[in-house]
Amino acid sequence: MSTDARFWIVVPAAGVGKRMGADIPKQYLDVAGKPVLQHTLERLLSVRRVTAVMVALGANDEFWPELPCSREPRVLATTGGRERADSVLSALTALAGRAADGDWVLVHDAARLCVTRDDVERLMETLEDDPVGGILALPVTDTLKTVENGTIQGSADRSRVWRALTPQMFRYRALKEALEAAARRGLTVTDEASALELAGLSPRVVEGRPDNIKITRPEDLPLAAFYLERQCFE
């Protein structure tokens, strides 16, 4: 594999965040004086080795043009799809002709605004010579139960369970083909690693930070603001 592989970032941002119950998509909600997506893009653009960030937007996104990062030279945009995998695939298709087959693509959730530059760079450095790639993840510390109809059926072995975070980093061609194959089979993939797993590959995990949270519910907003403030003093 070429040692000249570049690093691209894909940010699926076409969702509306129904669980937030807000009037605007959650990626545009204010946290500590800035929209969530602005925070996220600033963090990603702080990584020097990133060639460009491709953002997959909703078809009628009226908020994007107002975002300062939308005018950054390294920020590109395309129209996303209904599901996360559709948006990622749209972004990868938009990168055709720019990204080489062996280039790395890091897919990052728009709503993970607390990701740190150190975590992204460590993911790159750890996996850049890996044949498959991998993801930021966090070992599970809680006891996990399998439940059916409200009744506990068993306990998971938490020593073997990690919580998937983002970015998730894979070769351009391998990721695109894995997502296309899953779509042809009608399979739902909730993250990029799942698509690679279905293709018979074994992504690696790189331990990330517990404050790399995803904005999902209203109570996540003040928590994210707290983490952002705390990170300023590190």
UniProtKB/Swiss-Prot annotation:
Residue(s) at site: Positions MEP for the nucleophilic attack: 158, 214
Molecular function via GO: 2-C-methyl-D-erythritol 4-phosphate cytidylyltransferase activity
Pathway annotation from the record: Isoprenoid biosynthesis; isopentenyl diphosphate biosynthesis via DXP pathway; isopentenyl diphosphate from 1-deoxy-D-xylulose 5-phosphate: step 2/6
GO biological process: isopentenyl diphosphate biosynthetic process, methylerythritol 4-phosphate pathway
E.C. number: 2.7.7.60
Pfam families registered for this protein in UniProt: IspD
Principal EC category: transferase
Keyword vocabulary terms for this entry: Isoprene biosynthesis, Nucleotidyltransferase, Transferase
Catalytic activity: 2-C-methyl-D-erythritol 4-phosphate + CTP + H(+) = 4-CDP-2-C-methyl-D-erythritol + diphosphate
Site features described as Transition state stabilizer, chain residue numbers: 19, 26
Domain of life: Bacteria
Family annotation (PANTHER family): 2-C-METHYL-D-ERYTHRITOL 4-PHOSPHATE CYTIDYLYLTRANSFERASE, CHLOROPLASTIC
Role summary: Catalyzes the formation of 4-diphosphocytidyl-2-C-methyl-D-erythritol from CTP and 2-C-methyl-D-erythritol 4-phosphate (MEP).
Family assignment from sequence similarity: Belongs to the IspD/TarI cytidylyltransferase family. IspD subfamily.
HAMAP family: IspD
NCBIfam families, per the entry: ispD
The protein's name in its UniProt record: 2-C-methyl-D-erythritol 4-phosphate cytidylyltransferase
Gene that specifies this protein: ispD
